[in-house]
Each structure stands twice: as C-alpha cells, then as structure tokens.
Amino acid sequence: MDHREKSDRRLLLWFFAVATAVKLLLIPSSRSTDFEVHRNWLAITNSLPLTKWYFDETSQWTLDYPPFFAYFERFLSIFARLVDPRIVDLQSGLDYNAESVIYFQRISVIVSDLCLLYGVYRLTRKLEPLKRNLICALVIWSPGLLIVDHIHFQYNGFLLGWLLLSISFLQEGRDLLGGFLFAVLLCFKHLFAVTAPVYFVYLLRHYCWSGLVTGFRRLVTIGAVVVAVFAAAYGPFIYHGQIQQVISRMFPFGRGLCHAYWAPNFWVFYIILDKGLAVLLRKLGYEIQIPSASFTGGLVGDSSPFAVLPQITPLTTFAMVLLAISPCLIKAWKKPHSGLVARWVAYAYTCGFLFGWHVHEKASLHFTIPLAIVAVQSLEDAKHYFLVSIVSCYSLYPLLYEPQEYPIKVLLLLLHSVVMWLGFAAQYTDYKAQKKETSEIKSKFRIGCFEKSYLMGLIIVEIVSQFLHPYFLGDKLPFLPLMLISTYCTVGIMYSWIWQLRKILT
C-alpha cells in the first residue's frame, strides 16, 4: 500500500468518524413508529421458528421485508438478547422504550453503516483526490441519511452500501460480482427492484452479448448466480409451502396509492386534480361523493378511492414506471458503458419514486445517493445535484415534527448546502488558467435563475408552513402545510426527472 492510498483511507475514516460522532449525539432524539417496527422484528425472528415469521400478528407491525433482512434481524437479535432479553420478547417487549433498546437499535444502525463506508471507498478509490473527497462528504455526511436513519430510524445506509458496492464492481467490469451483489440487495429490500430492468439489460448486453457459445455460457452462469441467491433467501419458505404468504406480506397493495404524507411525486398532482374537480362538480350541481381526505393511513386496507378521475391500480403504476425507464433501457442496450451505470440507476429510481405505488418520501435517498457519484462528472451534473439534493432533504422535514428537532433539520440542510457549494466551487475552478489572466479567481459553479428562484421558493414554503399557517389558521386546515411542502417539492423532483432524461437521451 503506497503513501497516497494510506492517506486516502485516513481521510475517509475521518469523514466517517465525524459522521459517527454526530450520529451518537442524535441517539436521544425522538423516534418514529419504525423504531418499534424493527424492535418487533427482532422479537419475531428471535422468539419464533422461521416457519412463523411471516404469519405472526402479535403486533400490527408485521414482518414485511424479504428474507435476507429477516435473517439480518435474527442476527441482531442474538446481541439484543444479551443486552436486554425484554427487547426480543414478543409480548412484554411491545412498545418497549427503555434506554437499553434505544441505545442498542441506534448503535446497530451506526455499525451497519460500515457497509456504506466500504461502498463509498470502493467507488472512489481510483478517482482523483478532490472528486473522491467530495463524494465522501456528500454520501457519508448526507443529511437525508442522518434524518431518516439516525433520527426517524431505518437501515438505509446499510442497504445503499450494497447498492454502491454493486455499482463499483460494474464500473470495474466485474459484471458477475456486481449482479450477484444486486441480487443480494433485492433479497434484503425488494423496493430496490425498480432498477432491476436496467441491470438486466446492461448485464445482458455488456456481459452476455459476446458470441453464441461464450454468451450462452455467461447467461447461464449469471442466471445460476441469481437463482442461487434467491434460493438461499426464499428456499426455506418454498420448502415449507409459505412463499405465497411471504409475497403477500412483501407486496401489501391494499395500503393504497399514496402514503399518509404524500411523497413529492406525480400522484400528488393527480390527487389534487381529483379533489379540485370533485369540489367544482359538486358546486355545479353534480352528485359527487368526496372520499376521506387522507388517501391512506399507511395500513393495509386503509385507502380511499378517487372521486372523479380513474382509479389507479398497482399494474398502472408498474406500466408507467417501466415506460418512464424505457429510454434508459434503450440507451443501456445501444451503449452499455460501465461509466454510465450510476446515472442509469439513479434515473430508474427517480422514475420509481415519481410514478410508483405507495411511495414513501424516504425513497428519495435511492436516487440522491447515486446522483452524488454522478455529480462530480461534470459542471452540469453538479448544478443539478445541488438542486435535487436540497429538495430531497427538505421533503423529509415532515418526518421530524417535534419542536426540539427543528433546529437540527435546518442546521443539517444548511451545512449540507454549504459543503456542496464549497466542494463544487473548488472542483470546478481552473486555478492555473485564471492565475495567468487575473489575480482574481472565480469558480465556474453558478446555478441558473430558475434554480435560484425555486430554492428561494423553498424558504417561502417553509415560512408559510412553519410560522404563518399556525399563526393565522391555528388548528384549521392541518393538512395544508404538508400538502404545500409535498406539492412544491414535486415540482423540483419532476424537474430533476426531466433533466436526467434529457441527459440520458443526449
């Protein structure tokens, strides 16, 4: 190992150490229902035999992730039992919130982020120092990950680490290993399958399309690898005749099109249009039955139909996502370049976020993290990432609704914006050329008028939602701030989708 590589690793560890210190400080922060969800999964996998994992209904927070994540929870439960046996008790552990369970689960997320650290390391180890350091800062210090994983509570950093590892191997031309890791990721969390068509087309064209004999051998090889991964995950449940129950838990379509807090996607406009038309038609004398205001509360069977516009089914959203991804698939087939994989993956997840079924706002991390890798490739990519990462982070604000958390989320976004600005300004400044012409050094990193105006609009939205609404309306129209945030952020995400599509087509 040369001196440069040692220095790079030390700097990466410094980034991770700073992030870890912040995460430790966030341990006492408030927790979402996801905290109890994962505690209950620890109890299920530790207290029950495998054959009962996907049948247990002791709590409403039933196990609905793929088997590899269940195995992961089972592994964690071994240590949880040593820390406090009540953590993994199905009955007495319900809604258990002692310090032991809080610290154990928080620290388990922090430790699992080592997977993210290794993914970033593999992706950036061959880049020039400035680009590498910038990606490390954007990913490891991601405010979205801090909010979702280390306050709200989830394991997105761990899962995204698998995704980054997969992309890193594809970029190195090690397609078989990249495909293997992606298959493993799907068996941890099936929602990452949105980009599976991209992987399929790319691997078929780049890895298998090399002559009849060689191509067929490679196709059989990678097919066998994927089948082996899924057999390891689902084999025990197939053996016990429970695969249908597992699938029904993983795909609870009865939860409805949208989550309780509307994720900033295309369906926000569809819902608003439906409600607006319903009100208008009723005023015009038509008998229109207006359903309840919340399209879903997040539980199975808790969803509302549309009043005027056609009902949307899971099949409809699947078709729309596939149609939106299709230009990327065509590009991947015509030009299967490994350097474009991260861009295609990010675009596919953007499509899934915009047009998918029952999308959570947290899913924006699926495309903002890969886009951080893309951001260092060109000045235009940096400008785009600056906008979309701010919008994505701001759309997560409703997850933290406690008054004491307000300074935290504002500070995280402000610091992230400053880090991005300084990093991109340094990345896209030609010091040598400018020193020859003038003593004044100016960066090429400037965002356009639309981007400036839109970001200023975010400040206005926040002032209205956080201060003006409660001051003037009090408890009236409680849904208005969330609807305003979701609608305004949708504009930014739609802009990002169009920008990415244009970039892929050109």
Curated annotation (Swiss-Prot):
E.C. designation(s): 2.4.1.265
Family matches, as Pfam families: Alg6_Alg8
Superkingdom: Eukaryota
Uppermost EC category: transferase
InterPro entries: Glyco_trans_ALG6/ALG8
Chief localization: endoplasmic reticulum
Location relative to the cell: Endoplasmic reticulum membrane
Topological type in the membrane: Multi-pass membrane protein
One Gene Ontology MF term: dolichyl pyrophosphate Glc1Man9GlcNAc2 alpha-1,3-glucosyltransferase activity
Transmembrane segments: 10-30, 101-121, 133-153, 176-196, 219-239, 261-281, 305-325, 339-359, 384-401, 406-426, 454-474, 479-499
A biological process from GO: protein N-linked glycosylation
Listed GO CC annotations: endoplasmic reticulum membrane
Catalysed reaction equations from the record: an alpha-D-Glc-(1->3)-alpha-D-Man-(1->2)-alpha-D-Man-(1->2)-alpha-D-Man-(1->3)-[alpha-D-Man-(1->2)-alpha-D-Man-(1->3)-[alpha-D-Man-(1->2)-alpha-D-Man-(1->6)]-alpha-D-Man-(1->6)]-beta-D-Man-(1->4)-beta-D-GlcNAc-(1->4)-alpha-D-GlcNAc-diphospho-di-trans,poly-cis-dolichol + a di-trans,poly-cis-dolichyl beta-D-glucosyl phosphate = an alpha-D-Glc-(1->3)-alpha-D-Glc-(1->3)-alpha-D-Man-(1->2)-alpha-D-Man-(1->2)-alpha-D-Man-(1->3)-[alpha-D-Man-(1->2)-alpha-D-Man-(1->3)-[alpha-D-Man-(1->2)-alpha-D-Man-(1->6)]-alpha-D-Man-(1->6)]-beta-D-Man-(1->4)-beta-D-GlcNAc-(1->4)-alpha-D-GlcNAc-diphospho-di-trans,poly-cis-dolichol + a di-trans,poly-cis-dolichyl phosphate + H(+)
Pathway: Protein modification; protein glycosylation
Keywords: Endoplasmic reticulum, Glycosyltransferase, Membrane, Transferase, Transmembrane, Transmembrane helix
Function comment: Dolichyl pyrophosphate Glc1Man9GlcNAc2 alpha-1,3-glucosyltransferase that operates in the biosynthetic pathway of dolichol-linked oligosaccharides, the glycan precursors employed in protein asparagine (N)-glycosylation. The assembly of dolichol-linked oligosaccharides begins on the cytosolic side of the endoplasmic reticulum membrane and finishes in its lumen. The sequential addition of sugars to dolichol pyrophosphate produces dolichol-linked oligosaccharides containing fourteen sugars, including two GlcNAcs, nine mannoses and three glucoses.
Family statement: Belongs to the ALG6/ALG8 glucosyltransferase family.
Full protein name: Dolichyl pyrophosphate Glc1Man9GlcNAc2 alpha-1,3-glucosyltransferase
Species of the source: Arabidopsis thaliana
Source species taxonomy: Eukaryota, Viridiplantae, Streptophyta, Embryophyta, Tracheophyta
